[in-house]
Amino acid sequence: MDDKWIPVTEPLPLEKRQLEGMKVDVLLSPYDVPEAVRGFIRKDHKVFLIEFKYISQEDTIERPQSEHVKLRVGRNSGRLYAIELDLQKFGANHVQLRLEVAEALKNVLTHLVKEPVSPMRATNYKMAKKVVENHEDCILQPI
């Protein structure tokens, strides 16, 4: 396992909201923004795992997303801590595998943003998607 974390350098995003007829900018909590991300293959289980590290850590629970995708979210916060992709689903060569995993990862994150596991963490899921998009080459390097 490559446990090298990739530092996340994205600035805290502003989210524009309408409150009682006024437009306001809401800053995402630094506790919801990953500090680092990593991707690696768990060879014993033939799983590609993408993990997110935050300022504070907590116990996680597993949430199946589909037959071949599992999410690990914070037990109390609902923050996204990991995405597990079952590599046995992909019966492709090395180059094709990387493309298929990248596509599956984008689909999982897009679905998570549209239908959040925890509606209160929708901005955390958007930030996780942005982090993965910005660091995709490094995250998928083990494949």
PLM regions: where:
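Residue-level recognition of conserved beta-strand positions in structured domain cores
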Residues: 52, 84-85
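Intrinsically disordered terminal and processing segments
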Residues: 1-70, 75-76, 91-143
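Hydrophobic "anchor" residues
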Residues: 79-80
